From Swiss-Prot:
One of its GO terms (molecular function) is transcription cis-regulatory region binding. Its main location: nucleus. Residues 93-154, 180-207, 269-315 are annotated as: Disordered. The keyword Glycoprotein does not apply. It comes from Oryza sativa subsp. japonica. SUPFAM superfamilies: Homeodomain-like. Homo- and heterodimer with other ZFHD proteins. A zinc finger (ZF-HD dimerization-type) spans 41-92. The gene is ZHD9. This is Zinc-finger homeodomain protein 9. Residues 95-113, 288-304 have a biased composition (Pro residues).
Length: 341
């Protein structure tokens, strides 16, 4: 058996680990759709319900050139699957950059050990392999020091939240229910959401209108001026009005509004005349009121019963009349008795 001369190549360990050769990512060849391999046409975006006011897609996912397509005739570039022209399909350039990767969330900070708990320690093997007393001293110091809670990771999570708008073909397939549904939602930062609305705390409260207060003297002076002007402002009276307004202490516009509002109260307009006529008519229709000068005589007292007979209750006059009649009859009987004798 022949001896073989074998040479071993020494291995090199940079930084204590073997570096693996990075393999380049395989690039898939782009599929050309009648454009000479330069561009790729994806899903069909033609709206088949545009005449009805809606939005409907045919579902074609990629442009496939028909056998009768001629690059020299642009009108013949139609899809063999859906029959639509190539311009209705979404154009995707070959050298378009890949979409950005999703943001990586930061790992949560490790929780510090509580007092009285033992944590596993990862120790690297030393030269000697023995342990010194300094490790135990350090562990006692770790147990005795105060434990502070970790900071909340809310700020880091909010800072890494990035909004990626949807692709145009996805926005077109949402339907024609409204423009508000096609627009991407706005992302508001926590600071902007917590900030109060501009304009103070009033918000939508309407502003209260300022009302001018007049004193009794100002009202009297304005009434005198209005009566002098005939409750009308004319151009020839501007100098007088300006002078009186300076003396009274009110503006010309304020005096004009006051005169217009109180014209019917002091002048007696149509409403005042109507109320006066109605009150006079009511007074004329009412009968005159004459209070009695002397009280009426009292009614006679009711009769009182003085005797009782078989016929009922008799008054004193009736009893007297009956007694008189009885006496007369007795005298007649006495006078007739001697004659008969």
């Amino acid at each position: 058996m022949e001896a073989m001369d074998v040479k071993y190549k020494p291995l090199v360990f940079p930084n204590g680990a073997i570096k693996k050769a990075a393999k380049p990512a395989a690039v898939a060849p782009a599929v050309g759709g009648g454009g000479g391999g330069e561009t790729v046409y994806r899903e069909c975006l033609k709206n088949h319900a545009a005449s009805l006011g809606g939005h409907a897609l045919d579902g074609c996912g990629e442009f496939m050139p028909s056998p009768a397509a001629n690059p020299a005739d642009p009108t013949s570039l139609r899809c063999a699957a859906c029959g639509c022209h190539r311009n209705f399909h979404r154009r995707l350039p070959e050298g378009s950059p890949p979409p950005p990767p999703p943001p990586a969330l930061l790992p949560a900070p490790p929780m510090p050990p509580h007092r009285g708990e033992e944590t596993p320690e990862v120790r690297l093997p030393g030269v000697d392999g023995d342990e010194s007393d300094s490790d135990s001293d350090g562990s006692e110091y770790d147990d005795e020091r105060s434990v502070s809670p970790p900071p909340p990771p809310l700020a880091a999570a909010v800072a890494h939240q990035v909004y990626y708008p949807s692709a145009p073909h996805m926005l077109l397939s949402l339907g024609s229910s409204g423009q508000a549904q096609r627009l991407p939602p706005q992302v508001m930062s926590p600071a902007a959401a917590a900030a109060p609305p501009p304009g103070g705390g009033g918000g939508g409260m309407p502003r209260k209108r300022f009302r001018t207060k007049f004193t009794a003297e100002q009202k009297q002076r304005m009434q005198e001026l209005s009566e002098r002007l005939g409750w009308r402002l004319q151009k020839r009276d501007e100098a007088i009005v300006d002078e009186w307004c300076r003396d009274i202490g009110v503006g010309k516009g304020v005096f004009k509004v006051w005169m217009h509002n109180n014209k019917h109260n002091y002048l007696g307009g149509h409403s005042a005349r109507r109320s006066a006529s109605s009150s006079s008519a009511a007074a004329a229709a009412a009968p005159p009121f004459n209070p009695p000068t002397s009280p009426p005589p009292p009614p006679p007292p009711p009769p009182h019963a003085t005797d009782f007979n078989i016929n009922g209750t008799a008054t004193a006059a009736t009893a007297a009349a009956a007694a008189t009649i009885a006496a007369g009859n007795h005298q007649e009987n006495g006078a007739s008795s001697p004659q008969s004798a």
